[in-house]
């Protein structure tokens, strides 16, 4: 079925920054997608096109990307007359039209908006939900797998004030019997955590960060983990709810001396206290021995390959590559060859089309990696990643705390999918890393 209209506009994300929204119109109606954007972005990501005009939106406008959709991509794609159900052909055409390796010509934000809106049009034409269409495109087996929600309940690093270096502390309800129960457990722990943070650190500690987590004035990882452990205990889920961390260590890596500065937010940071990667690896291991940590994301800097391989050999929990792999097939291949990690963080806007995102997941599965589908810190009401997580059988999704509508939108969408699928879906639970094989 041909596309009759493609129209892009500038809308706002959850941080008040402009982002791209794309409408694709076919005989089945209007199909809309909004593109997210990140705060801590890896240097190997696909290029997000921003206007750079400091007099508007501080240079963060997306009018160029919008114009590229309306004047270049839209007319060309309509003229090409590709079937909207043929996602790989559409995405291949978009990449060819751009002509660069990192989508810097038309902008990954322009291309992704079109790619995702076309996927929704394709699902509508088949008369199936988006997750079912994605499952067909990826060739995943049945039953569907509902992901474990990794809920970012406490923020540090670049996402918060305070001296805490690590960026995210997540709760992982992997013992729950279903997705809806997992979400209930997470929400209950989150409420306890918020109350505890206010009690211990003052009223403002209940304020939430970009992703809905609390950001009390915490100095160390132990302090953060103790607070979360106490909240889990108060909610009655000790032993049932695990913990995951996203360290985002590229943010505090001193490349010139190859050391990590856990006090990076302090301008007077003492270089004698900076850690080598071996010392940082030992810190992670001591934390994992003391707390129920099942997953660590970006434990080392994005180009400190030696550190990743060293850590991988000596640890037994999930090691997730985000800045390391940036959902890029070439980087994933290198990480597999160097045995750097065992799970991929899948962010569709890092690679820029749905087809390449599916391929990144398949490449990861082929080497027995886990795949965690992820939001960005600048999010919107778009829920596509919920359908992607279910369609790919990824078994794990990271989309913030059970707080702030742009985070809940995804979790609520999975609740709807769970209800719709009934017996035809299983909850990944503790098998989240190997969910694709369930």
Curated annotation (Swiss-Prot):
According to its UniProt record, the EC number is: 4.2.1.11
Where do the annotations place Mg(2+) binding? 246, 297, 322
Q: Mostly located where?
A: cytoplasm
- Describe which pathway this protein belongs to, using the record's wording: Carbohydrate degradation; glycolysis; pyruvate from D-glyceraldehyde 3-phosphate: step 4/5
Q: Which reaction does it catalyse?
A: (2R)-2-phosphoglycerate = phosphoenolpyruvate + H2O
Needed cofactors, names only, are: Mg(2+)
What does UniProt list as catalytic? Answer: 211, 347
Which residues are recorded as binding substrate?
159, 168, 297, 322, 374-377, 398
Q: How does it assemble?
A: Homodimer.
Q: Which GO terms describe its molecular function?
A: IgE binding; magnesium ion binding; phosphopyruvate hydratase activity
Q: Which family is this sequence assigned to?
A: Belongs to the enolase family.
The name this protein goes by in its record? Enolase
């Amino acid at each position: 079925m041909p596309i009759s209209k493609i129209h892009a506009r500038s809308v706002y994300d959850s941080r008040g920054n402009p982002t791209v929204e794309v409408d694709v119109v076919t005989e089945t109606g209007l199909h809309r997608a909004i593109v997210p954007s990140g705060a801590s972005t890896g240097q190997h990501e696909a290029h997000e096109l921003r206007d750079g005009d400091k007099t508007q939106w501080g240079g963060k406008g997306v009018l160029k990307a919008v114009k590229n959709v309306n004047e270049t991509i839209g007319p060309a794609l309509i003229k090409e007359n590709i079937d909207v159900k043929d996602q790989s052909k559409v995405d291949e055409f978009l990449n060819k039209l751009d002509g660069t390796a990192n989508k810097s010509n038309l902008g990954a934000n322009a291309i992704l908006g079109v790619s995702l809106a076309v996927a929704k049009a394709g699902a509508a034409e088949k008369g199936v939900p988006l997750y079912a269409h994605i499952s067909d495109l990826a060739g995943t087996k049945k039953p569907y797998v509902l992901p474990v929600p990794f809920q970012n309940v406490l923020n540090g690093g670049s996402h918060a004030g305070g001296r805490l270096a690590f960026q995210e502390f997540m709760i992982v309800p992997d013992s729950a019997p279903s997705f809806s129960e997992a979400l209930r457990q997470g929400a209950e722990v989150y409420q306890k955590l918020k109350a505890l943070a206010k009690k211990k650190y003052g009223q403002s500690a209940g304020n939430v960060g970009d992703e809905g987590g609390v950001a009390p004035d915490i100095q160390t990882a132990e302090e953060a983990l103790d607070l979360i452990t106490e909240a889990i205990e108060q909610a009655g889920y000790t032993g049932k709810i695990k913990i995951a961390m996203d360290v985002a260590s590229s943010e505090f890596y001193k490349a010139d001396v190859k050391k990590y500065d856990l006090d990076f937010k302090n301008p007077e940071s003492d270089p004698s206290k900076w850690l080598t990667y071996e010392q940082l690896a030992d810190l992670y291991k001591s934390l994992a021995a003391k707390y129920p940590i099942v997953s660590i994301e970006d434990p080392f800097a994005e180009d400190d390959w030696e550190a990743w391989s060293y850590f991988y050999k000596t640890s037994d929990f999930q090691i997730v590559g985000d800045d390391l792999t940036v959902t890029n097939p070439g980087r994933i291949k290198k990480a597999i060859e160097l045995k750097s990690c065992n799970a991929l963080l899948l962010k569709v806007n890092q690679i820029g089309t749905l087809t390449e995102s599916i391929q990144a997941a398949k490449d990861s599965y082929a080497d027995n990696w886990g795949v965690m589908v992820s939001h960005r810190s600048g999010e919107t009401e778009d829920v596509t990643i919920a359908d992607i997580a279910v369609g790919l059988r990824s078994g794990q999704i990271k989309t913030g705390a059970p707080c702030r509508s742009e985070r809940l939108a995804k979790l609520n969408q999975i609740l709807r999918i769970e209800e719709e699928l009934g017996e035809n879906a299983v909850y990944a639970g503790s098998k989240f890393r190997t969910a694709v094989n369930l």
